[in-house]
């Protein structure tokens, strides 16, 4: 069934809409679904970054006025091709990371151990669980309670690097705790001063 005139928007067209809240939205049509009356507009980035854009999903049932500024009549450009192997690799990596997290939880690893693992994994991808131990680059093993002194391995750059990561992790955790305590005490001080 063909859409009545004015109720169909071609990809690439420039449109302006006024919402029921009197907000004016303007942008390029990137998608339109006639049945659900949903319109996707590409607008300049609200962050102001030059190579970014905002995508707004607009339910046309809540729009009081739509104006087509520039109707695109020619065929829209073809969609960009997707690198399926890259997407599959990314999905596989994400799945492996989630399974690793699930393993750590099921193995009874402490929250501190899980957080340390995530911190190390951000820097060194070659990081895995071996029961409750963290194994980094097949060279360094960190055993519970996961402190610097629990880092074992052949003396060298790998062990030294992992120890530095562990030290920094616990410094950052301690700094965060101090900050949270001071923020928690602030309202108490203000309440005491006001009474």
From Swiss-Prot:
Compartmental location: Cytoplasm
Naturally occurring in which organism (per UniProt): Homo sapiens
Phosphothreonine found at: 75
InterPro entries in the record: AD, Lsm12-like, LSM12_ABD, LSM12_LSM, Sm
One Pfam assignment: LSM12_LSM
UniProt modified residues of type N-acetylalanine: 2
Name used for this protein in its record: Protein LSM12
Region named Required for NAADP and TPCN2 binding: 4-67
